[in-house]
């Protein structure tokens, strides 16, 4: 049992939407396939992964560093203790060979896309959905239900409040009872108007969360918090840069 190839393709997201920071018309994403020599149900097992749509594709790092470290490692060094499957933790260690600990940047995006594909391949080799495999690994009963919400409410050219309301209504029609919208990409007054429009649309049968995508400084974050506290919001997310420690401590 071994990994025989790791393939990556970088594709444009090419969407006119934006949040408080990111213009997705300029954004790319990496799609990764981890190819194994294992065959299940007559098909070769391939695990798939992709990076966050808020980060650029990382094909360069994947091909220059991380792909070869996995392919050049001995197959046995990448397997679990039972020898019947690949081990994501050992593969992660192989990827991080000769890498300095710590760091905040593109490396984590490249490693994460491969890591996702590795876990997908591992579950397919085991013949189980990943959530059940993870529970089995911890000796726990898998919960078939998980909390989910619909994230949307992006900004895009020509999107007015009626379009925003229709978008949020579409999530409710699909069974979601928690929705999230972007803030911080417009003025406080405009965002307040947008929030009120969504709350009016979803009524008391659903809940609304808001996400600033790390846009605010402390003063702006507090100004928004004072505005938001009058509304029954589920949460107020990511107010500032995660590396702005003074803001996070305030």
Locations of the language-model features?
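Conserved, mostly hydrophobic/aromatic
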Residues: 32, 44, 114, 127, ...
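Catalytic domains of carbohydrate-active enzymes, especially glycoside hydrolases
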Residues: 167-182
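Catalytic core of soluble alpha/beta enzymes
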Residues: 181, 185-250
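Metal- or metallocofactor-binding catalytic centers and their adjacent structured scaffolds
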Residues: 39-125
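N-terminal small/glycine-rich loop or linker at the start of catalytic domains
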Residues: 130-156, 201-205
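Structured beta-strand/loop patches that form or line metal/cofactor-binding pockets in enzymes
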Residues: 1-59
